[in-house]
Amino acid sequence: MHSDLLNSQSETLLALCRPGFEADLAAELNFHAADQMVAGYPRATANSGYVLWHSQQGSLASLQESGLIFARTLSVCEGEFSDIGDDRISALWPLLEAAGPFSELYLEHPDTNEGRELQRFLRGFRKALEPRLKKVGLLRRQAKQRLHLFFSDSHNGWVGTSPSAVPLVEGGVLRLRLPAEAPSRSALKVEEALIRFFGSADALNAKTAVDLGAAPGGWSWQLARRGIRVQAVDHGKMAPRLLDEYPVQHVYGDAFTWRPRSKVDLVVCDVVDKPARTLQHMEKWLTQGWATAALFNLKLPMKRRFQETWQLLEKLTAAMERMDHLGEPVIKAAHLYYDREEITVWASFHRSY
């Protein structure tokens, strides 16, 4: 057991990600470390599903609140445990006592085939640990930090914490149910994005929206089921039930050339195209005043995924900042659980969403 990972000069962060994106997450951590003049280095293994960041001087803990594109969760490590025996609670207890109290318990594992084999063990471990923590007051709802116990296997891992006020899902994996009436699985991306960015799938206060490249209508359905009137722009076929039962108007047109007659609250776009072209189009919708906010996907390049993505987001930020009469830009981006080779982006001029 190693409980002295942190001192006044050092810090270790544990970031979970989709397997295969460790290098992108490491590049993102390196970028923010350079930007904040924090000395340190990442430790990443391909397809492991997580990255460790070791700060030699300075801290990147502020990233827990601002978030990272490629990180599903981010916790500050309080200690590492290795080769602990079957009495895991006794082995971990001194560290838990020193780090507590906690608002909730997250038991996490890599999102890999091997990691998922730990789920049964972790369910049993929760039943044993959670009552013990509550009994001695180490687990109470009003605490300002949550506890992360990450197991790389059943005997090794890290103990970490994250601010309770930062909305996080255990393991960063938000498993959503797809209703039978949903036109496509892409509908889950919208729901996850709203929960990830705003803490609730019902956070939108929009009344009107445009869905560019809408067919068969997964994104339109997510908006319309919340009472938003949607213009669904696509030459393709929309789900008939969507048009019959929801406030959705099918507009035959091209996602990149169609223009609205009047301003809408929200434009959404999930098209398969070069990310630079998609971003430029969303930039136009926002800076021309056609929409107040945008939710869209950017397909990831094959190489330098973080660097290329960050450059595009910086370009969008600069363009929106030039329109300062519309307000301060708010841009959020994440590689969601239901994303694959893409990220989901929110951009607006208002903080009321």
Swiss-Prot record:
One GO CC annotation: cytoplasm
InterPro entries for the chain: RlmM_FDX, RlmM_THUMP-like, RNA_MeTrfase_FtsJ_dom, rRNA_MeTrfase_M, SAM-dependent_MTases_sf
EC number: 2.1.1.186
Compartments in which it is found: Cytoplasm
Pfam families: FtsJ, RlmM_FDX, RLMM_N
Keyword terms: Cytoplasm, Methyltransferase, rRNA processing, S-adenosyl-L-methionine, Transferase
Class in the EC hierarchy, top level: transferase
Protein's UniProt keywords contain Mitochondrion: no
Signal peptide: none
Record: residues binding S-adenosyl-L-methionine: 186, 215-218, 234, 254, 270
Entry superkingdom: Bacteria
Catalytic activity: cytidine(2498) in 23S rRNA + S-adenosyl-L-methionine = 2'-O-methylcytidine(2498) in 23S rRNA + S-adenosyl-L-homocysteine + H(+)
UniProt keyword Amino-acid biosynthesis present: no
Catalytic-site annotation from UniProt: 299 (proton acceptor)
A molecular function GO annotation: methyltransferase activity
GO biological process, one term: rRNA processing
Purpose: Catalyzes the 2'-O-methylation at nucleotide C2498 in 23S rRNA.
Family indicated by similarity: Belongs to the class I-like SAM-binding methyltransferase superfamily. RNA methyltransferase RlmE family. RlmM subfamily.
Quaternary structure and interacting proteins, as annotated: Monomer.
Protein name: Ribosomal RNA large subunit methyltransferase M
Gene symbol of the encoding locus: rlmM
